[in-house]
């Protein structure tokens, strides 16, 4: 993760964006040179740039289960502590019982239509829907969920400017 990603600058008024694990993972695992290399998927590069802009504006948010996914499977204690320290700069959106219930409803709605997803994905959808905030993700499953759920996906180009 680049130094710009580790600190939040001026928190400007504006909509917060719930960032999915996939985007955080892309930004955290790439070295700055790799994030702009021609061999990198252009969508991934755009997502990393979008996250960087959201972080700079103080609008990037997460939920606890995303934090857990990011911290799970870290190979060394030092890497874990470093990542934990970076992520501590970002608040978790507090979750309520209604978020879990809505996530279960979303899971059932999508499953009835043949669309599968993870519990974390549906919790992200529920939190974003209930709070009327967009989701930033490179995971194509979210486009499928959007067909059946009241969620908004943030196009990468809308973040900048």
Sequence positions of predicted segments:
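Short, well-structured N-terminal submotif of metal-dependent ribonuclease cores
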Residues: 1-62, 72-85, 159-161
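Active-site neighborhoods of divalent-metal-dependent phosphate/nucleic-acid chemistry enzymes
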Residues: 2-16, 91-136
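A generic structural signal for short hydrophobic patches within well-formed alpha-helices
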Residues: 24, 67-70, 142
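A general structural signal for well-ordered alpha-helical segments in protein cores
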Residues: 48, 63, 67, 80-83, ...
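Short, polar loop motifs at secondary-structure junctions
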Residues: 77, 139-141
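Short loop/helix-cap segments at secondary-structure boundaries that form the rim of catalytic
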Residues: 143-148
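Short beta-strand->loop
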Residues: 150-158
């Amino acid at each position: 993760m680049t130094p710009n990603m580790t600190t939040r600058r001026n928190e400007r008024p504006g909509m917060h964006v719930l960032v999915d694990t996939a985007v955080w993972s892309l930004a955290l695992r790439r070295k700055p040179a790799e994030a702009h290399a021609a061999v990198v998927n252009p969508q991934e590069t755009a997502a990393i740039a979008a996250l960087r802009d959201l972080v700079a504006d103080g609008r990037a948010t997460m939920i606890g289960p995303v934090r857990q996914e990011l911290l799970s499977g870290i190979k060394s204690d030092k890497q874990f502590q470093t990542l934990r320290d970076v992520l501590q700069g970002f608040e978790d959106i507090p979750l309520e019982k209604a978020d879990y219930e809505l996530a279960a409803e979303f899971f059932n709605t999508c499953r009835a239509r043949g669309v599968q997803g993870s519990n974390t994905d549906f919790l992200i959808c529920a939190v974003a829907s209930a709070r009327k905030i967009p989701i930033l993700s490179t995971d194509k499953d979210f486009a499928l969920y959007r067909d059946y759920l009241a969620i908004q996906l943030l196009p990468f180009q809308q973040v900048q400017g």
